[in-house]
Amino acid sequence: MKKRYFILFLCCVSWFTGRSAVTDSARIEHHATWKNWQKETAWQNPAIHGLSLTLPYSEVYVQMDYLHQSDPFVLQKGTGHFLSEAKAETFLRLSNHSSAWGAASYMTGKQYQVSWNSSSDYDLLNPYILADTLGGDTHRERYGFQGGYAVSKGKSQLGIEAIFRAEHEYRDVDPRMRGIVTDLTLRLGTAYDFGKYQWAAGLEGNVYKQTNDVDFYRELGVIPEFQMTGLGTEYSRFSGDKRTLYYKGGGYGINLDANPLNETGFYGHAKLWRRQYKRMLADLNSVPLTQLFYHSAEVSLGWKHMGGPRQVALDGNLVLIKRSGDENIIGKSSAQYYPIIGKLTMYKNYLIDTYLRGLYGWGSGSGTWCLNGKIGYWSNRERYVYPERKMEAAKIYGRLGGQWMRTLSRTVALTVDMAAAYYGNVSSGIVIPYANMKASFQDMINHQYQFEKADYGMLSAKIRSDYRLSGSQIGLFAELGGNWITCSENEHQHHLHLALGITF
């Protein structure tokens, strides 16, 4: 399996080589902060993404990523990781009216000291995970593929994009967890030029599946696996020795965008999406235990001037996410059939992130620089209905960053990024019936709340050097970056990243 994917990876790289040629302008277009200002909003529409870039650019590289926390900020994600990845990315301008882009990657590595989590994709499936009190290091493998195409005719644009991820996470000592994930996202976008604006709409669909199990081989016996249901609760009837389950889910979304055709004027973005994930117990004829629902709304409105040597942008953003969870009431079994006789919505989670961000930059033929800032309010409220449990925290945060890109000679270019951020807690609260909880569950919840309400400070830096081979359009690059995060609980995180590759 690995060999087949690796051959496909090399074939993709070989095909892309020779179809593009790197220039300083292409490097700036694909890496400058101001050129990618709307990457997380409008570029989710492939019709906009594919026609926002004008110059071909490809990279093939290997990278290593190391992260360590002195005490895990989130127990279920462990104390850090060491990951290695090989990746190829390309953008091709096929003609004045069409473009294609793609990526292929393989990642492998290790996640350290994961506890209270025996499932993959914790951020996505939390709180409906399989968990135990022992945990340990896990091994990770991931294959990723992405491809898109956009075309314009007259005033109309059309784009399509597919993103696929296959991931395998496992542990080779007891408790031997295993999670196998497949995740496919398809995007379709259209846009039309009318008046002074480009008006765009996009659709997105996602299909997700994970098979998840835990085994024990040691002679000392097993420990219970808990079917977690939120804020330190479990589905006790099916906890213990029921250790094989799977998740099925996915969803859909729609996004709308408006952008000025001359790169100066007001712009806006709105997105609505809905997803749901069922947890089913394979040990008991795939009876569904829980179902997690996501409802999200994103809105952004701003003004920008990106034409000429000066770049200015300012926008306001609001992200609302509602997560709710249903627990099925399962009747008495008959001939291995477990009837569902009802359901209760027991878990509720509300996340708010609202912020104002701005950018000011200056660019010329030999380089560009910009300053960018962000200030906002973040809130996370969780509730379990009965017995009543609550946990909440809110923070005000600010971030200031800068980027400097410069062509030092005909063959050497340099890029420097730096940033500082601070997240300060403004309110927090917890309601937990400790008297009715096991000691291990109490410790887990207290740890979660301890870091949920903490203050955080962050410093980050990244430097990249590009070298173009003499007489060739092929270049080499090296990139080194990292960050340092400290929190008010007297714990810290350090993160290092190294990448080496070629551009063409």
PLM feature segments, named:
Residues 233-373:
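Long, internal scaffold/assembly segments composed of regular secondary structure
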Residues 64-70, 106-110, 151-155, 164-168, ...:
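Transmembrane beta-strands of outer-membrane beta-barrel pores
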Residues 20-112:
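N-terminal, post-signal peptide beta-strand-biased segments of exported outer-membrane/organellar beta-barrel
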Residues 70-77, 113-119, 170-178, 212-219, ...:
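Outer-membrane beta-barrel translocator domains and adjoining extracellular loop/strand segments
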Residues 25-26, 492-504:
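Outer-membrane beta-barrel "beta-signal"
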Residues 54-60, 96-102, 154-160, 195-201, ...:
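Outer-envelope beta-barrel architecture signal
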Residues 86-92, 145-151, 186-192, 254-260, ...:
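Residues on the lipid-exposed face of transmembrane beta-strands in outer-membrane beta-barrel proteins
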